[in-house]
């Protein structure tokens, strides 16, 4: 059994009831009764007519029991391990005093700077000796005479 919906009121239309209205542009409307059809043809807005489903939806009629059922989901904070650090390590770091953390940070920075200085110091002595040998072997540059072309006469082609 196929049940249609009224295009105006929104009520169900059971088989053997209602009317069909086909507009010239090919759109077909189903109406429950002559009352709905005449209201539609008079271009009345179903949202402003008290007995239609659209009016009841717009003005939130008969939805009081649904409001009680609705429950919103709350976001819950959850602590878990991250790649490369277990939950125990993270909690230990978090529970440390700020002074201890600051001291550790400064020590790590100092160690990194010292390592960088040592790396640069190892690089520097080797570099000047290589440069000195190339400086003595280099010959002075001689300027090449520029080839002067004849002036172009005529257009582009």
Curated annotation (Swiss-Prot):
Q: Which InterPro entries match?
A: L24e/L24_sf (IPR038630), Ribosomal_eL24 (IPR056366), Ribosomal_eL24-rel_N (IPR000988), Ribosomal_eL24_CS (IPR023442), TRASH_dom (IPR011017)
Similarity comment: Belongs to the eukaryotic ribosomal protein eL24 family.
The terms describing its cellular component in GO are:
cytosolic large ribosomal subunit
Asked whether the keyword Zinc-finger is assigned, the reply is: no
Location in or out of the cell = Cytoplasm
The protein here is known as Large ribosomal subunit protein eL24
User: SUPFAM superfamilies annotated for this entry?
Assistant: Glucocorticoid receptor-like (DNA-binding domain)
Subunit info here reads: Component of the large ribosomal subunit.
The protein's UniProt keywords, in alphabetical order, are:
Cytoplasm, Ribonucleoprotein, Ribosomal protein
Q: What does this protein do?
A: Component of the large ribosomal subunit. The ribosome is a large ribonucleoprotein complex responsible for the synthesis of proteins in the cell.
| Region annotation Disordered: where it falls in the sequence | 94-157
């Amino acid at each position: 059994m196929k049940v249609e919906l009224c295009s105006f009121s929104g009520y169900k239309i059971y088989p053997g009831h209602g009317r069909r209205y086909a507009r010239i542009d090919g759109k077909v409307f189903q109406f429950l009764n002559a009352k709905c059809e005449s209201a539609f043809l008079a271009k009345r807005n179903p949202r402003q007519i008290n007995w239609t489903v659209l009016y009841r939806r717009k003005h939130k009629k008969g939805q009081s029991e649904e409001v009680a059922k609705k429950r919103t989901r709350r976001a819950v904070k959850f602590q878990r391990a991250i790649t490369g650090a277990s939950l125990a390590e993270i909690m230990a770091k978090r529970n440390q005093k700020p002074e201890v953390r600051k001291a550790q940070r400064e020590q790590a920075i100092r160690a990194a700077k010292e390592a960088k200085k040592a790396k640069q110091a190892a690089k520097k002595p080797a570099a000047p000796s290589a440069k000195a040998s190339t400086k003595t072997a280099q010959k002075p540059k001689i300027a090449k005479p520029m080839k002067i072309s004849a002036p172009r006469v005529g257009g582009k082609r």
